[in-house]
């Protein structure tokens, strides 16, 4: 199952030395991708040979103007193999769908064919919001729906009626919707995945086997999934 893991070190206080050590651990473990903030991308890029470099964009809030998001993703595409970009959450919650559509089509296009995972921040969404957002993500040509930044606010999530961490139930619902719609999208679950048992339950709930082109698990503790 380790080959499905996106090993993420995204805390704001991460040091350069810790980012370098993380890259070496990623190579040693054989994870799918090593995920870092943009500042570390040039530092860790030369250290990754087997493992893909994933860089986050507009993380964790999804609050930059579209022009800034396009410029950032375009630059990241020069160094990253994969880009995890946060959806414009405020626009989603405002249900300004035309603006969300314009943003994501432009931002995904700026990645120049790199694998793009759009972070929906599931803990913050009502069903009518999440399913409309999934439709737009598919239309934009992204490659994965990613469930969370891992930085979601528990109190707000509770007011929306959602758990703050990944669950098999949410994983199954995302996969089911993708299948029903016939979308060519993978599922990446992230947020609170800290044991092999949790990971297996989520992968089983998705029901697509263990293909990293379709299923990913985001965690900061990959060794716990061995």
Swiss-Prot record:
It catalyses: 2-deoxy-D-ribose 5-phosphate = D-glyceraldehyde 3-phosphate + acetaldehyde. Pathway: Carbohydrate degradation; 2-deoxy-D-ribose 1-phosphate degradation; D-glyceraldehyde 3-phosphate and acetaldehyde from 2-deoxy-alpha-D-ribose 1-phosphate: step 2/2. CDD domains: DeoC (cd00959). GO terms for cellular component: cytoplasm. Keywords: Cytoplasm, Lyase, Schiff base. The active site is at residues 84, 146, 188. It comes from the Archaea. GO terms for biological process: 2-deoxyribose 1-phosphate catabolic process; carbohydrate catabolic process; deoxyribonucleotide catabolic process. Optimum pH is 6.0 for 2-deoxy-D-ribose 5-phosphate cleavage. It is found in: Cytoplasm. One of its GO terms (molecular function) is deoxyribose-phosphate aldolase activity. SMART domains: DeoC. InterPro entries: Aldolase_TIM, DeoC, DeoC/FbaB/LacD_aldolase, DeoC_typeI. Its EC number is 4.1.2.4. Catalyzes a reversible aldol reaction between acetaldehyde and D-glyceraldehyde 3-phosphate to generate 2-deoxy-D-ribose 5-phosphate. Belongs to the DeoC/FbaB aldolase family. DeoC type 1 subfamily. Homodimer. This is Deoxyribose-phosphate aldolase. The gene is deoC.
